[in-house]
From Swiss-Prot:
Entry GO CC: cytosolic large ribosomal subunit
Keyword presence, Transferase: no
UniProt-listed GO biological process terms: translation
Taxonomy, superkingdom: Bacteria
Subunit structure: Part of the 50S ribosomal subunit. Forms a cluster with proteins L14 and L19.
UniProt organism field: Microcystis aeruginosa (strain NIES-843 / IAM M-2473)
InterPro entries: Ribosomal_uL3, Ribosomal_uL3_bac/org-type, Ribosomal_uL3_CS, Transl_B-barrel_sf
Assigned protein family: Belongs to the universal ribosomal protein uL3 family.
A Pfam family this chain is assigned to: Ribosomal_L3
Positions of region (Disordered): 131-155
Record's function text: One of the primary rRNA binding proteins, it binds directly near the 3'-end of the 23S rRNA, where it nucleates assembly of the 50S subunit.
Gene Ontology terms for molecular function: rRNA binding; structural constituent of ribosome
Gene designation per UniProt: rplC
Keywords: Ribonucleoprotein, Ribosomal protein, RNA-binding, rRNA-binding
Name of the protein in its database record: Large ribosomal subunit protein uL3
């Protein structure tokens, strides 16, 4: 139960370690600022949490109930809202901005986002199935093979790997290292790759799992 931040993936680049000179591949994320739009307490809601928003939009992009909710917090219209549960939310106030400063260099974070959508894909591309022979009279090139038994059970079991929508799913990459923080521009440089293409919405939170 700890606070995170919403951000946008800008792309990938590399930076060099000052001591070893080794190139480090990093993803640049525009993190926040995320104003607090609601503070929940045990007295009013039964649990402690804060709700934050991200990405300013025009008023016509939101409905009236949401505009009224944001007006109570005294913030401009925001596209995305997310809630973080806390043990004690008393330290936060409406309108307070959450910035990239909540993380430090060397921190481990979990990054959640939507992967790149690749449309309807076949067995080899989606599940890495082995294809059949391309010559020697083979008529099985990219077919899936057997999908189950015959009359009994007389159906294909749920979960069978088949062709279908590939990508465009919610994925969390865990225990990525924060390489650098740019407080002035609210940028976070994260070692390695994160889900999605440039422009993807990301949810960055402190790592929940530790160890190998």
């Amino acid at each position: 139960m700890s606070i995170g931040i919403l951000g946008t993936k800008l792309g990938m680049t590399q930076i060099f370690d000052n001591k070893t000179g080794v190139a480090i591949p990093v993803t640049v994320v525009q993190a926040g600022p995320c104003p607090v739009t609601q503070v929940k307490t045990k007295k009013t809601d039964g649990y402690e949490s804060i709700q934050v928003g991200y990405k300013t939009v025009k008023e016509k992009a939101l409905n009236k109930p949401l505009l009224g909710h944001l007006a109570k917090a005294g913030v401009s219209p925001l596209r995305h809202l997310i809630e973080y549960r806390l043990e004690d939310a008393s330290a936060y106030t409406l309108g307070q901005e959450i910035t990239a400063d909540i993380f430090q260099e060397g921190d481990l974070v979990d990054v959640a986002g939507t992967t790149i959508g690749r449309g309807f894909s076949g067995y080899q591309k989606r599940h890495n199935f082995k294809r059949g022979n391309m010559t020697h009279g083979s008529k099985n090139h990219r077919l899936p093979g057997s999908t189950g038994a015959g009359t009994t059970p007389g159906r294909v079991f749920p979960g069978k790997r088949m062709a279908g929508q590939y990508g465009s799913t919610q994925v969390t990459i865990r225990k990525l290292s924060v390489v650098k923080i740019d407080s002035e521009r609210n940028l976070i440089l994260i070692k390695g790759a994160v889900p999605g293409k440039p422009g993807t919405l990301l949810n960055i939170t402190p790592a929940k799992k530790f160890g190998k």
